[in-house]
């Protein structure tokens, strides 16, 4: 797996050094700590990274912590996060989450995935993002990029992000988990795009099923129609170093 992750970074740096993902930017900036990453992940759904980062910075310039956001008026929050998709729904959701963090956890975001997924709008991907970017705990957040690229490479053969997460957890040594989301997301945004992936410059194409089987040239989908029982290909038997 290290070879794949390093190859992705080498490819991106050779083509054009990628912009940090919104969550990595929040992690580096330490804007509001773990709570900002929790809120930022909720806001990031169906939103461009640059918009997410700007909105989160503006939001935490106004509301510094869970208690302040919990007491915010919905229309004021809507006004701040308007540049992102579904801002009305998300405004209500993040205020609800702020109230839970403030009242049930004393303002501190829990580091337990079961407690995180019990919050409004927080699924496994969001919870795993919090574990990785807020607490640097090993987890594999699977979004559309991680799901697509994992299937294209032939690491897994799955239908849903949930299946992909479970398959990758069995396949990849835990020491590599922290790098997967950040690297795969940047690679999916810049190189291994949903349409017209840049296979010609990809330094890991020799290990890519999508490229080696000719699916990239034929314009085929990233995942074959047939799927063996269990949600993962025989590739899941490979032990990565």
Where are the model-predicted features located?
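N-terminal polyanion-binding entry modules of DNA glycosylases/AP lyases
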Residues: 1-111, 175-176, 183-241
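Catalytic DNA-binding helix-loop module of base-excision-repair DNA glycosylases/AP lyases
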Residues: 40-43, 94-100, 108-154, 161-167, ...
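Amphipathic alpha-helical protein-protein interaction surfaces
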Residues: 48, 122, 135, 139, ...
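Alpha-helix N-cap/helix-start motif
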Residues: 52, 139-143, 161, 177, ...
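Alpha-helix N-capping/helix-start residues
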Residues: 74-75, 124, 144, 174
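Ferredoxin-type iron-sulfur electron-transfer modules in oxidoreductases and energy-metabolism complexes
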Residues: 170
């Amino acid at each position: 797996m290290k070879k794949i992750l390093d190859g992705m970074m080498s490819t991106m740096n050779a083509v054009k050094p990628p912009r940090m993902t919104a969550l990595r930017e929040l992690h580096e900036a330490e804007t509001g700590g773990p709570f900002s990453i929790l809120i930022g992940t909720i806001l990031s759904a169906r939103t461009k990274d640059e918009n997410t980062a700007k909105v989160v910075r503006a939001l935490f310039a106004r509301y510094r912590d869970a208690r302040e956001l919990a007491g915010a008026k919905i229309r004021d929050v809507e006004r701040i996060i308007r540049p992102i998709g579904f801002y009305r729904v998300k405004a209500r959701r993040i205020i609800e989450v702020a109230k839970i963090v403030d009242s049930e956890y004393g303002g501190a975001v829990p580091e337990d995935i079961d407690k995180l997924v019990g919050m409004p709008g927080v699924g496994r991907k969001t919870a795993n993002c919090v574990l990785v970017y807020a607490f640097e705990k090993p987890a594999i957040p699977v979004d559309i990029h991680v799901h697509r690229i994992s299937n294209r490479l032939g690491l897994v053969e799955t239908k849903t992000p949930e299946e992909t997460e479970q398959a990758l957890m069995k396949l990849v040594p835990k020491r590599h988990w922290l790098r997967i989301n950040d690297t795969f997301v940047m690679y999916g945004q810049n190189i291994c795009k949903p349409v017209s992936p840049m296979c010609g410059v990809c330094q890991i194409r020799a290990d890519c099923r999508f490229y080696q089987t000719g699916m990239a040239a034929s314009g085929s989908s990233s995942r074959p129609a047939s799927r063996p029982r269990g949600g993962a290909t025989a590739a899941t038997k490979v032990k990565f170093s």
